[in-house]
Amino acid sequence: MSWQTYVDDHLMCEIEGTNNHLTAAAILGVDGSVWAQSANFPQFKPDEISAVVKEFDEAGTLAPTGLHLGGTKYMVIQGEAGQVIRGKKGPGGICVKKTGQALIFGIYDEPVTPGQCNMIVERLGDYLVEQGM
């Protein structure tokens, strides 16, 4: 299965019981290389990804500045140190799950809820961890 298939079928899929989808999603290598992304995933800067990776290594580094992706600033609200970063901006937000080799990004807006985005992103991330990725 290609990485694009994971993005299209597992991240940008219809959310169970609703007719809703994430706004954008991507799978990147921890080096910042794009493995696959949805058509509308924001054009990001390498230093934005470096800051996300640093947060996974040293939890709390993004709290003062926020998580920036494609020029959009998300307030970091919670997460699981070394595994998940969650951020909020207005009615939407972002969830980033780290596996051994990849970063999985999900971006959402209403009517998608933070919990729905977290479930989609973290479910794929947990699967990839189980597969040794």
From Swiss-Prot:
User: Which is one GO molecular function term here?
Assistant: actin monomer binding
Q: State its role.
A: Binds to actin and affects the structure of the cytoskeleton. At high concentrations, profilin prevents the polymerization of actin, whereas it enhances it at low concentrations.
What PANTHER family does the database record attribute to this sequence?
PROFILIN (PTHR11604), PROFILIN-3 (PTHR11604:SF35)
Family annotation (InterPro entries): PFN, PFN_euk, PFN_sf, Profilin_CS
Q: Which organism is it from?
A: Kali turgidum
Query: Record's CDD domains?
Result: PROF (cd00148)
Name where it mostly resides: cytoplasm
Note the superkingdom of the native organism.
Answer: Eukaryota
Name one cellular component (GO) term: cell cortex
Q: Where in the cell is it found?
A: Cytoplasm, Cytoskeleton
Q: In which tissues is it expressed?
A: Expressed in pollen.
SMART domains per the UniProt record, alphabetical: PROF
> What is its quaternary makeup?
Occurs in many kinds of cells as a complex with monomeric actin in a 1:1 ratio.
Q: Which Pfam families match?
A: Profilin (PF00235)
Family, according to the entry, reads as follows: Belongs to the profilin family.
Which protein, by its recorded name, is this? Profilin Sal k 4.0101
Sorted keywords for this record are:
Actin-binding, Allergen, Cytoplasm, Cytoskeleton, Disulfide bond
Q: Give the organism's phylogenetic lineage.
A: Eukaryota, Viridiplantae, Streptophyta, Embryophyta, Tracheophyta
| Matching SUPFAM superfamilies | Profilin (actin-binding protein) (SSF55770)
Which pairs of Cys residues are joined through disulfide bonds in the record? C95-C117
